[in-house]
Every structure is written in C-alpha cells, then in structure tokens.
Regions:
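C-terminal accessory "lid"/substrate-recognition subdomains
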Residues: 151, 155-205
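Nucleotide-state-sensitive switch-loop elements of NTP-binding domains
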Residues: 2-13, 18, 22-142
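Flexible active-site lid/hinge loop adjacent to a nucleotide/diphosphate
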Residues: 140-153
C-alpha cells in the first residue's frame, strides 16, 4: 500500500515590525491560498479586506477567497492535530497545505522541532519551507540586537526584504544576511505581488 501523501507546511516568521501581518492579511484572501489552512498566532479579531473575523476557541473560519483560518489555542501541536482530525472527519473543507505564522519574537527552532518530533504530525505533514520577513529599515539593527531576529533569518529558505519603499536593501543588511544565511533565496516584498509566490514557490525542502 502506498504511503499517504503528507501535507506541505510553510512556517512564516519575521521580527516585530517586519510587515509579516501585512503580508498575511493580503495572503488570506488570495486565490493562491484557496486550498490552504493558515494558523495565525493571535487570538481575537483580524481585519481582512474590511471584514472582521472573530476567532473563538475551536473556530475555523472560511474566508472569502476560500482559505481556512484558525488561531493557535494553547499550543501549536494540539492546534495542528485538531485541524488534521477535523479534515479527516469531514468537519471542515479539505485543504492541501498549511501555513503557520509565528509571533514576531519567536525563535523558529521549537516550532520546527514540533513538526518533526510529534509522531502524528511527522506522519501527516512535512516542512515545505521557512519564509522570513526582514525589515529593510531596521532589519540590520534588529539582527544585531535580538538573537531571535538572527535565528529567524538563519533558518529561512526564503528571505523577504520588506519596506524597500522606505529604505533600499543596502550592503549593511545584505552583509548581515550573508553571514547568517547565504543559501536562502531573496525577494523584495514590493515586487512580490502574489502572496503565493512568497509563501510557496521555491520553498520545498
């Protein structure tokens, strides 16, 4: 019997102020995410195209573009297991991939560990990639000052440089990123009009 296909899972991270929430808000109603379950890190209301989606315990909201969205309750592993169980039972519409948003201060390492260490998640999911937003204005200073910002950049498969409309992607930030992670592809957020390109293209590990 062939092995069941696992769900590709993308981790979206970025330090405070990097524009991660802005990207996520655009992505949530994009056609590219119509078959995607997105796990956000904040419980409560999020404004999406003038709609307020109110997340309550256990809720999974289908957004206008067809994306399924829920908020982390208690811990990520439990949230992921619940989504997978409800998908298998037909309680929610089937999805083909998952995006996990981290908090701005999160070290991604424990999240990546969770995906591989939990037996059920390891059986049902695979890590497609890590996408990290880096602020062109304050990114170099954040990397120097905050270990979490450096770790977010270091584990990325894709580095998305944001706020290049306010400051160029200059040699200082480029040097920091080269020292931390010279293998990741780099995108400028202002030229990445399709959130699906940012989140999915080229991130398969």
């Amino acid at each position: 019997m062939p092995e069941p296909e696992t769900l590709p899972t993308t981790v979206l991270t970025g330090f405070l102020g990097s524009g991660k929430t802005t990207l996520l808000r655009r992505a949530l109603t994009a056609p590219a995410l119509a078959d995607t379950a997105v796990i956000i890190n904040e419980i409560g209301e999020i404004a999406i195209d003038h709609h307020l989606v109110d997340f309550v315990e256990g809720s999974v909201v289908e957004l206008p573009g067809g994306c399924l969205c829920c908020a982390v309750r208690e811990d990520l592993a439990r949230t992921l297991r619940s989504l997978i169980d409800r998908r298998a039972a037909g309680d929610i519409r089937a999805f083909r991939r998952i995006v996990v948003e981290t908090t701005g201060l999160a070290d991604p390492a424990p999240i990546l560990y969770t995906l591989g260490a939990d037996p059920m998640l390891d059986h049902c999911l695979h890590l497609a990639g890590v996408v990290t937003l880096v602020d062109a204005v304050a990114g170099a200073a954040a990397i120097d000052r905050f270990p979490e910002a450096a770790r977010q950049a270091a584990v990325a498969d894709t580095l998305v440089i944001s706020k290049t409309d306010l400051a160029p992607f200059g040699p200082e930030l480029a040097s920091r990123l080269d020292g931390l992670n010279d293998r990741a592809r780099r995108l400028l957020a202002c030229t990445a009009d399709d959130p699906g390109v940012v989140l999915f293209d080229g991130t398969t590990r």
